[in-house]
Amino acid sequence: MQARANARSARRRAREFALQGVYAWLLRGGEGTQDAGEIDAHLRDAEDFSEADAQWFKTLLHGVLREAPVLRERFLPYIDRPLAELSPVEHGILLIGSFELMHHVEVPYKVAINEAVELAKSFGGTDGFKFVNGVLDKLAADVRTAEVQAAPRR
């Protein structure tokens, strides 16, 4: 039971490592993809990287860094403050969540949002998860309209 309670899926671990990479990239200025290989290699050297889905990590990290300007453009209308005022953690989580919503329709929108919320609970500020949930929920309604409308309401 203890092992199950502490276990996280390989995809969740991949998202956690991707967030660390996006965070490092944002701290370096958050422009271009020239640092992607170095960030990727550094994170793969982490002791517990073997617990992560390496392919999903690569997809997320490199995809987010490549698509960041477009991703930001899509979530900007839904944030309640200037982009510069977002913490690097919230910014990184929104980039990852937006990337999943926009480029990976095989991941159900509720899963993409929930995974981003879990990242925010683990790594973000006190109520950061509420902010992330609200922004990604609005983005999902825009980019996954049919899926959101077809989902049963609680």
UniProtKB/Swiss-Prot annotation:
Q: Name one GO cellular component term.
A: cytosol
The GO molecular function terms of this record are: RNA binding
UniProt xrefs under SUPFAM superfamilies: NusB-like (SSF48013)
Signal peptide span per the entry?
Answer: none
Keyword RNA-binding carried by entry: yes
The domain of life is: Bacteria
Keyword terms of this UniProt record: RNA-binding, Transcription, Transcription antitermination, Transcription regulation
Q: Do you know which InterPro entries this protein is assigned to?
A: NusB-like_sf, NusB_fam, NusB_RsmB_TIM44
Among NCBIfam families, the record links this protein to: nusB (TIGR01951)
Give the protein's function: Involved in transcription antitermination. Required for transcription of ribosomal RNA (rRNA) genes. Binds specifically to the boxA antiterminator sequence of the ribosomal RNA (rrn) operons.
By sequence similarity, the record places it as follows:
Belongs to the NusB family.
Protein name, entry field: Transcription antitermination protein NusB
Native source organism of the sequence = Bordetella pertussis (strain Tohama I / ATCC BAA-589 / NCTC 13251)
